């Protein structure tokens, strides 16, 4: 029966396919809205990685799952895997350690400081485009080697954590002492929307300005690379030019010169490069472009064995050390022992070997017994010797092995944890005790927090301080909205708004900010003086509470009695705990919530609003209600009146939406101010309002207008206030990883 059923079903399927073939083709050729209206504001960044996309469900909490994990057992399994070479992808030198180090490095190494995107959190290396980047060739096999371990521990360890932890275990299994490990990287379930560049071809580079500088927020020199081309800028083997690019790209990952040298020298102590054949003649499509039968694997190599001694990855070929699966000083030793000359790999890529044929038999082959090679270096390796600053560091490390080892351990820890945010998010027993400046340290809570009665009394004192509702709201928003969810930095905790550099950011209106902070500091000091029993309140808490009681007052004046939630427990950081240059990248070039826009902005005002909302992890309705509420509260930067569509500024009314949707107003571009619009009465021609594109997009964009109509309806006021408070509270607590 089975033998006849299958062909019958196949014939039926074929007949149906032929019958409905026209419809299938039509579906494949659907033309989306973005084609017809390419300038239409894209709201999709605010809809990515929705809770509904998570197969574990809304009740799943990764931190709790991770805490139940026996990390020592996981480590034991990973160590065993290191030397269990698989026939379908044999280990170089019988050890997968170097392969897993590359996997972990390339997972974390896409992090960039300017927008906080990239990094190991989310496990994005599993998804396009990262899973198919030229710089990630064959890392699909590394993750498949790890699948049995991921399968065993399931929801208790994320791919993001597993990849980094495996890199750590790999280092330890080869004799290196790591600095520590922290779990806490929650997996994503779809590819993150990231601007990786506008190039249309791999390894192309069209990301520099007229001065030759890499455009922000890019972190790599070419499309599809993690950092730089190892052969030199655009393949030109110039070590000094390579050093310049290395310094720039690693700096964009928050690494200084010493950390950069430690990472490159430490990482290249292990493993080898793979360029046994010409990729153009041997290597097939990347994972994303491969057929379903490949099951997510790519770069199939048709030459020789297709792996082992025939492996093709970067096209460069060889090892740096004679013992590539052990921690040694050989990388730096050989770098300075030999003079290096250019040669080409079997794949035709430029690399370097010792001059005069020296050390021709120093390096054992990774797979063939009794076969040996000369050591090799990339152009980017020679850069560490030729650049004067890098040379000073490498020679010092060569003379001081323990200093080098600690520098690499700390740099590796920073590389793999930089995108996790503050230490409060770290999980596990291997978290190092030392507090590091790049972790944006905040003092641990050292006092009893105030209770509800204290909160009410403090709120009344803030309202009696002479500060206005707009001033309190603007200050609280400026403090809390510095948060960015891409790398969990910024936010109200720490009260860094009173420190350099935040206190002088243009968007924060420094003159007004100084006045408000002075009054709030006095309130804090006086109130703490009245408290007993070890209770205190931080300035960070006072700033947030000030905004919250101002919102309550504004809602009451609009006829809605509400209580804005407030959770004390924030602490105040010091200037010594604040790296000014590191925090400088958090400065907003635009903040549509405050109608602030500067000439340094990379996109239009409306697009920058979406970017800011995305950083704050807001949804489309949350963004909409916050903009409308902040306009009604008169919270624009520097008090500008654009978008304040109300005759009762400082009151939490839905007037912004009511008046935006009012057909008695006719909008036109201002003839006096570029980028400003004027709303005039259709009958009298009298000027009623002024607005920015950020204001008007809530009436012009069909989806945003749909949300605005909810809040602008006659029954919308109560909903508006309640939704505003929920969204406000979300922003105020965005960095409260302790609650």
Curated annotation (Swiss-Prot):
<keyword id="KW-0575">Peroxidase</keyword>
<dbReference type="InterPro" id="IPR010255">
    <property type="entry name" value="Haem_peroxidase_sf"/>
</dbReference>
<feature type="signal peptide">
    <location>
        <begin position="1"/>
        <end position="26"/>
    </location>
</feature>
<keyword id="KW-0732">Signal</keyword>
<dbReference type="GO" id="GO:0020037">
    <property type="term" value="F:heme binding"/>
</dbReference>
<dbReference type="GO" id="GO:0004096">
    <property type="term" value="F:catalase activity"/>
</dbReference>
<dbReference type="GO" id="GO:0042744">
    <property type="term" value="P:hydrogen peroxide catabolic process"/>
</dbReference>
<feature type="site" description="Transition state stabilizer">
    <location>
        <position position="102"/>
    </location>
</feature>
<keyword id="KW-0376">Hydrogen peroxide</keyword>
<keyword id="KW-0560">Oxidoreductase</keyword>
<dbReference type="Pfam" id="PF00141">
    <property type="entry name" value="peroxidase"/>
</dbReference>
<dbReference type="InterPro" id="IPR002016">
    <property type="entry name" value="Haem_peroxidase"/>
</dbReference>
<keyword id="KW-0349">Heme</keyword>
<dbReference type="InterPro" id="IPR000763">
    <property type="entry name" value="Catalase_peroxidase"/>
</dbReference>
<comment type="similarity">
    <text>Belongs to the peroxidase family. Peroxidase/catalase subfamily.</text>
</comment>
<dbReference type="InterPro" id="IPR019794">
    <property type="entry name" value="Peroxidases_AS"/>
</dbReference>
<feature type="cross-link" description="Tryptophyl-tyrosyl-methioninium (Tyr-Met) (with W-105)">
    <location>
        <begin position="227"/>
        <end position="253"/>
    </location>
</feature>
<feature type="cross-link" description="Tryptophyl-tyrosyl-methioninium (Trp-Tyr) (with M-253)">
    <location>
        <begin position="105"/>
        <end position="227"/>
    </location>
</feature>
<dbReference type="GO" id="GO:0046872">
    <property type="term" value="F:metal ion binding"/>
</dbReference>
<keyword id="KW-0479">Metal-binding</keyword>
<comment type="subunit">
    <text>Homodimer or homotetramer.</text>
</comment>
<comment type="function">
    <text>Bifunctional enzyme with both catalase and broad-spectrum peroxidase activity.</text>
</comment>
<feature type="binding site" description="axial binding residue">
    <location>
        <position position="268"/>
    </location>
    <ligand>
        <name>heme b</name>
    </ligand>
</feature>
<dbReference type="GO" id="GO:0070301">
    <property type="term" value="P:cellular response to hydrogen peroxide"/>
</dbReference>
<protein>
    <recommendedName>
        <fullName>Catalase-peroxidase 2</fullName>
        <ecNumber>1.11.1.21</ecNumber>
    </recommendedName>
</protein>
<keyword id="KW-0408">Iron</keyword>
<dbReference type="InterPro" id="IPR019793">
    <property type="entry name" value="Peroxidases_heam-ligand_BS"/>
</dbReference>
<dbReference type="GO" id="GO:0005829">
    <property type="term" value="C:cytosol"/>
</dbReference>
<feature type="active site" description="Proton acceptor">
    <location>
        <position position="106"/>
    </location>
</feature>
